[in-house]
Amino acid sequence: MCMNRFFTENRKRGFAYRLKQSTFNTQYVDIIVDSKEPRYYLAIECKSLKGKRLSFSSNFHKDKDGVHQIDNISGFISYTGRRGFLAAEFRGGPKNEAYLMPWELVLEYFDSAASIPIEAFRECVVLERITGGYRLPAGLPEE
């Protein structure tokens, strides 16, 4: 996993784990990262998509009560005190591209647009493609 590789390579203390999806349990985000460093105490939602835009209507869902996934994730981030990120992998071009976008920026787009273009992701944290996955080359920006 990208974050665990980062912790190992940079001799930092932290651990990332993917939450299993279940029909009967609520899963707020895909990856939880625990670390004593607040910078790496994270909640990460992952999206893998074809195309050049991430759509809030087709790439996210509403729960049985009609609450949008963005709102549920935002509540989880606020309640737990974690830093939120959206990991987006864009597939189908000459090469796959992946990025981490801070959750605050995701919310800005959610409040003002129907989708987020790939160009906006390219201005965020770039994940380097390596054999078997991705690598976080430089760490995360301070809050």
Question: Can you name each region flagged by the protein language model?
Answer:
Residues M1-F24, K36-E37:
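Acidic-basic catalytic patches of nuclease active cores, encompassing PD-(D/E)XK
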Residues M1-K12, Y99-E143:
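Helix-rich interaction surfaces within compact, conserved domain-sized segments
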Residues Q21-S22, K36, C46-L49, E89-R91:
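Histidine- and/or cysteine-centered catalytic micro-motif in compact active-site loops
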Residues Q27:
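Beta-rich catalytic cores
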Residues I31-V33, Y40-K52:
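Conserved catalytic cores of phosphodiester-cleaving nucleases, focusing on short active-site segments
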Residues K36-Y40, G93-N96:
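Short, solvent-exposed loop/turn segments that connect beta-strands within catalytic domains
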Residues L49-N72:
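Mg2+/Mn2+-dependent nuclease catalytic core
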Residues S74-V106:
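Nucleic-acid nuclease catalytic cores
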